[in-house]
Amino acid sequence: MNDPNGLCFWNGFWHLFYQGYPPEDPRQHWGHAISKNLIHWEDLPYAIYPNPEGRCFSGSTFVEEDRVIAMYHGTDAGNIVAVSTDPLLLNWEKLTGKAVIPIPVQDGSPQEYTVFDPCIWSKGGKYYSLSGGTLLTKPGGLRRAADFLFRSNDLIHWEYLHPFTEGDIFTLVGDDGACPYFWPIGDKYILLFYSHMSGGQYLLGDYDKVRDKFSVFSGGLFNFGASTPSGVHAPSSTPDGLGGVVTIFNMNPGMDTKGWNQIMTLPRLLTLEND
């Protein structure tokens, strides 16, 4: 068991998906568990199987009135959208049967964006998605965390807009922006993500909905020490409906484990206090 994915509330249950695989197919699938209280969980059959992608990596969900949308990274393909309408989210249909945001062709030229772990939301009748990754810094060729913004009318055809965050002085050179989740919190917005170098992190700021930019004014770590082996890693989060954000991380059980055999944390409720 590895990253938690797609935490959401649907039809009276909390749903948590996660990277896992059955004994007969050692490729990442999306496992699935449900809970009434975020503490006691019941495991369900695997929700999403890898095809045509090599493996189902991390992603998020977006709940609409009549369906739940999942968007995740499929290795060797790109970012994939699947939808479900049934009461327990047991059955998922992948739109188009292929990646809706394919991995760019590597031809040696500079890349505008990277395609990796996505999150998804809607605004003004359109869908928006972040793709986690890095930006090349100059001089020196070092990389910094970045998340790249895409927009779509129909979940199938996506256009690339630009790097999403501005004013980030809180992440370090060498961080990346994997497993992003972007949600309102209080009267601000929070971007949660995972750096393979520094562990779970967040950025806090204002969402300029005209320019589609995230102006950052604060940030921090979810670990107060080393991120491995016992720190928290990838987040999965969803709004609580009251202005807060519920988040679950994965973590090693206090020691190094083989094959990313990890555990999930207790849920954290993130809220924004007045200055």
What are these regions (language model features)?
Residues 57-59, 178-180, 232-235:
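Repeated scaffold domains used in trafficking and secretory/extracellular systems
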Residues 1-117, 121-173, 184-229, 248-275:
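Beta-rich carbohydrate-recognition and catalytic domains
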Residues 238-242:
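Structural secondary-structure packing elements that flank or coincide with functional cores
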